[in-house]
Protein backbone atom coordinates (compact mmCIF):
# COMPACT_ATOMS: atom_id res chain seq x y z
CA UNK A 1 0.00 0.00 0.00
CA UNK A 2 1.42 3.34 -1.04
CA UNK A 3 -0.16 5.46 1.71
CA UNK A 4 -1.68 8.00 -0.68
CA UNK A 5 -5.26 7.39 0.35
CA UNK A 6 -7.65 10.09 1.48
CA UNK A 7 -7.47 9.13 5.14
CA UNK A 8 -3.68 8.63 5.22
CA UNK A 9 -2.41 12.07 4.12
CA UNK A 10 -1.78 14.96 6.51
CA UNK A 11 -3.75 18.16 5.96
CA UNK A 12 -1.48 20.91 4.66
CA UNK A 13 -0.97 23.72 7.17
CA UNK A 14 -2.49 27.11 6.38
CA UNK A 15 0.05 29.33 4.61
CA UNK A 16 1.64 31.89 6.94
CA UNK A 17 3.25 34.99 5.47
CA UNK A 18 6.72 36.07 6.51
CA UNK A 19 5.23 39.40 7.55
CA UNK A 20 2.88 37.72 10.02
CA UNK A 21 5.71 35.51 11.31
CA UNK A 22 7.76 38.64 11.98
CA UNK A 23 4.74 40.50 13.39
CA UNK A 24 4.92 43.20 10.71
CA UNK A 25 2.39 44.99 8.52
CA UNK A 26 4.89 45.74 5.74
CA UNK A 27 5.27 42.99 3.09
CA UNK A 28 8.48 41.02 3.70
CA UNK A 29 8.01 38.99 0.49
CA UNK A 30 7.71 42.11 -1.66
CA UNK A 31 10.76 43.71 -0.01
CA UNK A 32 12.72 40.49 -0.69
CA UNK A 33 11.66 40.51 -4.34
CA UNK A 34 12.64 44.18 -4.73
CA UNK A 35 16.03 43.54 -3.11
CA UNK A 36 16.68 40.70 -5.56
CA UNK A 37 15.47 42.59 -8.63
CA UNK A 38 17.26 45.81 -7.70
CA UNK A 39 20.76 44.38 -8.32
CA UNK A 40 21.99 45.59 -4.93
CA UNK A 41 23.88 42.34 -4.37
CA UNK A 42 24.28 38.97 -6.01
CA UNK A 43 22.54 37.20 -3.13
CA UNK A 44 20.06 38.34 -0.47
CA UNK A 45 19.93 36.68 2.95
CA UNK A 46 16.68 35.53 4.54
CA UNK A 47 16.88 38.05 7.39
CA UNK A 48 17.64 41.12 5.28
CA UNK A 49 14.12 41.76 3.92
CA UNK A 50 12.60 41.19 7.38
CA UNK A 51 14.95 43.75 8.94
CA UNK A 52 14.43 46.27 6.14
CA UNK A 53 10.63 45.88 6.29
CA UNK A 54 10.75 46.41 10.07
CA UNK A 55 12.83 49.59 9.68
CA UNK A 56 10.51 50.96 6.99
CA UNK A 57 7.46 50.16 9.11
CA UNK A 58 8.97 51.89 12.16
CA UNK A 59 9.87 55.05 10.22
CA UNK A 60 6.42 55.16 8.62
CA UNK A 61 4.68 54.74 11.98
CA UNK A 62 6.85 57.47 13.53
CA UNK A 63 6.12 59.98 10.76
CA UNK A 64 2.40 59.15 10.68
CA UNK A 65 2.06 59.55 14.44
CA UNK A 66 3.67 63.00 14.36
CA UNK A 67 1.63 63.98 11.28
CA UNK A 68 -1.55 62.83 13.02
CA UNK A 69 -0.68 65.04 15.99
CA UNK A 70 -0.10 67.97 13.61
CA UNK A 71 -3.48 67.32 11.96
CA UNK A 72 -5.19 67.20 15.36
CA UNK A 73 -3.51 70.47 16.36
CA UNK A 74 -5.05 72.04 13.23
CA UNK A 75 -8.45 70.51 14.09
CA UNK A 76 -8.40 68.24 11.03
CA UNK A 77 -9.16 64.53 10.78
CA UNK A 78 -7.30 63.90 7.51
CA UNK A 79 -3.51 64.02 7.16
CA UNK A 80 -2.41 66.22 4.25
CA UNK A 81 1.12 66.89 2.92
CA UNK A 82 1.28 70.06 5.05
CA UNK A 83 0.91 67.94 8.21
CA UNK A 84 3.70 65.61 7.03
CA UNK A 85 5.94 68.62 6.39
CA UNK A 86 5.25 70.11 9.84
CA UNK A 87 5.82 66.73 11.51
CA UNK A 88 9.16 66.11 9.77
CA UNK A 89 10.59 69.63 10.05
CA UNK A 90 9.70 70.00 13.74
CA UNK A 91 11.43 66.72 14.65
CA UNK A 92 15.21 67.10 14.83
CA UNK A 93 16.15 63.54 13.82
CA UNK A 94 13.58 63.19 11.03
CA UNK A 95 14.55 66.61 9.69
CA UNK A 96 18.19 65.50 9.56
CA UNK A 97 17.26 62.22 7.82
CA UNK A 98 14.94 63.91 5.30
CA UNK A 99 16.81 67.21 5.06
CA UNK A 100 17.20 67.16 1.27
CA UNK A 101 13.65 65.90 0.64
CA UNK A 102 11.03 68.22 -0.87
CA UNK A 103 7.43 67.45 0.03
CA UNK A 104 4.97 68.61 -2.64
CA UNK A 105 2.28 70.94 -1.24
CA UNK A 106 4.14 70.93 2.08
CA UNK A 107 4.73 74.65 2.49
CA UNK A 108 7.32 76.04 4.88
CA UNK A 109 7.65 76.28 8.65
CA UNK A 110 6.27 79.50 10.09
CA UNK A 111 9.28 81.54 11.21
CA UNK A 112 9.75 85.27 11.79
CA UNK A 113 13.24 86.52 12.62
CA UNK A 114 13.47 88.20 16.03
CA UNK A 115 14.93 91.38 14.49
CA UNK A 116 11.81 91.87 12.37
CA UNK A 117 9.40 91.72 15.31
CA UNK A 118 8.19 95.06 16.72
CA UNK A 119 10.33 96.25 19.63
CA UNK A 120 8.78 96.39 23.06
CA UNK A 121 9.77 99.86 24.29
CA UNK A 122 9.31 100.91 27.86
CA UNK A 123 8.98 104.60 26.93
CA UNK A 124 5.30 104.12 25.95
CA UNK A 125 4.45 102.55 29.29
CA UNK A 126 6.17 105.37 31.23
CA UNK A 127 4.50 108.07 29.11
CA UNK A 128 1.03 106.62 29.77
CA UNK A 129 1.69 106.48 33.50
CA UNK A 130 2.51 110.25 33.77
Curated annotation (Swiss-Prot):
The modification N6-succinyllysine is found at residues 10, 96. The modification N6-glutaryllysine is found at residues 96, 100, 119-120, 126. InterPro entries: Histone-fold, Histone_H2A, Histone_H2A/H2B/H3, Histone_H2A_C, Histone_H2A_CS. The modification N-acetylserine is found at residue 2. The modification N6-lactoyllysine is found at residue 10. The modification N6-(beta-hydroxybutyryl)lysine is found at residues 10, 14, 37, 96, 119. GO terms for biological process: heterochromatin formation. Residues 1-22 are annotated as: Disordered. The modification Symmetric dimethylarginine is found at residue 4. The modification N6-(2-hydroxyisobutyryl)lysine is found at residues 6, 10, 37, 75-76, 96, 119. The modification Phosphothreonine is found at residue 121. The modification Citrulline is found at residue 4. Residues 7-19 have a biased composition (Basic residues). Core component of nucleosome. Nucleosomes wrap and compact DNA into chromatin, limiting DNA accessibility to the cellular machineries which require DNA as a template. Histones thereby play a central role in transcription regulation, DNA repair, DNA replication and chromosomal stability. DNA accessibility is regulated via a complex set of post-translational modifications of histones, also called histone code, and nucleosome remodeling. This is Histone H2A type 1. It comes from Homo sapiens.
Amino acid sequence: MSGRGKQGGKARAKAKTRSSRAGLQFPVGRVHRLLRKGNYAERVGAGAPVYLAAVLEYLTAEILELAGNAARDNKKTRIIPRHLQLAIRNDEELNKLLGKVTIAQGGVLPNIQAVLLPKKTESHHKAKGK
